[in-house]
Amino acid sequence: MTAILERRESTSVWARFCDWVTSTENRLYIGWFGVLMIPLLLTATSVFIIGFIAAPPVDIDGIREPVSGSLLFGNNIISGAIIPSSAAIGIHFYPIWEAASIDEWLYNGGCYELIVLHFLLGVACYMGREWELSFRLGMRPWIAVAYSAPVAAATAVFLIYPIGQGSFSDGMPLGISGTFNFMIVFQAEHNILMHPFHMLGVAGVFGGSLFSAMHGSLVTSSLIRETTENESANAGYKFGQEEETYNIVAAHGYFGRLIFQYASFNNSRSLHFFLAAWPVVCIWFTALGVSTMAFNLNGFNFNQSVVDSQGRVINTWADIINRANLGMEVMHERNAHNFPLDLASVDAPAVQG
């Protein structure tokens, strides 16, 4: 018997690295987008944790009145936040080497820009990594498309809005109470609750939650029993089996009788497309709404639009919202200006003497 030995071609370190990065056999897929994503998100997370614990106060309004946001400077988990960059910086790119010292960089809120820019690039790379893994496995690309909705929303809030307003100091603080403060100020300045794209976003979030709960409960309630009544129904299935685990006809029949026939899907692909598309499209619209309000194309304004025959204003709910908006606008940045912009820009009424 003759044995033939073949010499294995030696592959370079770079080739082996490429094979490892793009291998779908790894426990966690890395991918070329992952090579970028991992350091970006690690940087954003590390700086966020350190800043949340120990960052010194930041001169957010650019008026030499620093605002404390970290735990070591008197905050708790609820009130703590990474304070946005100073209005004195505006939307300038402000890396560490642009400041005269680390103290100056911290005082002007350099942490915020560093975290936000690394985070946005990181989540964009995560989306690319989803597409990359789908491509390697021969799957369709819609997982990454669905993830584009939260990526668009984060980009609108953390990047487009500050650009439109002219300063990263108008971005959302990275904390619990800071998020609510951002929402209140956004309503005061842009009347977002009266913007149709925000209304679509609310419908997407609440509707998506409702549809998810309905779908999950219907599927769980219509499992095809493969076991005896003395065993768990879960024991009758194995991961990756070809046979369906639930009876869509039974689920369709139940829901059709519960509401009406045409309110229920009888096609699994149509159903799951709808479950994915509804929240994704609605969040796309919300991101688009925030991006337009960034440039002050605001929500509907029906203030004092109802008057009687004598021209006297008949107050409506819109006027009450307007008064609430003015109150919120007066309260924020209270030391940066004497009047809210809406009041300061109106001509003073003539005084009869």
Curated annotation (Swiss-Prot):
CDD domains noted in UniProt: Photosystem-II_D1
NCBIfam families: psbA
Note: 2 of the reaction center chlorophylls (ChlD1 and ChlD2) are entirely coordinated by water.
Site-annotated residues for Stabilizes free radical intermediate: H190
One Gene Ontology cellular component: photosystem II
Binding-site residues, pheophytin a: Y126
Site feature: Cleavage: A344, S345
Binding site for chlorophyll a ChlzD1: H118
Keywords: Acetylation, Calcium, Chlorophyll, Chloroplast, Chromophore, Electron transport, Herbicide resistance, Iron, Magnesium, Manganese, Membrane, Metal-binding, Oxidoreductase, Phosphoprotein, Photosynthesis, Photosystem II, Plastid, Thylakoid, Transmembrane, Transmembrane helix, Transport
Complexes and interactors: PSII is composed of 1 copy each of membrane proteins PsbA, PsbB, PsbC, PsbD, PsbE, PsbF, PsbH, PsbI, PsbJ, PsbK, PsbL, PsbM, PsbT, PsbX, PsbY, PsbZ, Psb30/Ycf12, at least 3 peripheral proteins of the oxygen-evolving complex and a large number of cofactors. It forms dimeric complexes.
Binding site for chlorophyll a PD1: H198
Short name of one Pfam family: Photo_RC
Example GO BP: photosynthetic electron transport in photosystem II
Name of the molecule in the record: Photosystem II protein D1
Location in the cell: Plastid, Chloroplast thylakoid membrane
Modified-residue entries (N-acetylthreonine), positions: T2
EC number(s) from the headed UniProt entry: 1.10.3.9
Residues at which a quinone binds: H215, S264, F265
Transmembrane segment boundaries: 29-46, 118-133, 142-156, 197-218, 274-288
Family: Belongs to the reaction center PufL/M/PsbA/D family.
Topological category with respect to the lipid bilayer: Multi-pass membrane protein
Catalytic activity field: 2 a plastoquinone + 4 hnu + 2 H2O = 2 a plastoquinol + O2
